[in-house]
Amino acid sequence: LGFGMNSMQEPAEIYKTAILSIIQTIRSEHPDCEFLLVSPMIPNPEIRGFQHNQLPAQQDALYQIAAELKGICVAPVHSIFRELVVHKKNYLELTGNCINHPNDFSIRVYAQTILSVLGC
């Protein structure tokens, strides 16, 4: 499950409740279903409305879910993108629209993060 960018201002507890609801709905019919929870990339840090987003706390909420329930792991894409920017990767090199959508490079970051979590 990969949700979050459009809900970046929601408090982590509301976000967590929504993700848990999806998991519970699916597991009500498929109790052995496993989940990979994917946090989103970072939005453009220069856009004022995005500067106080809840994405770090929401990623923490994904880890809480993984700790509370069996068969769930987290792909911390958000943390990877934060590290890329900290280490001087220009945000415009990460985005397809200069705001919050991934480009080809970013899609590879998503894929590599997910494959790493899966142990590939």
Where are these regions (language model features)?
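Alpha-helical cap/lid subdomain in secreted, periplasmic
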Residues: L1-C120
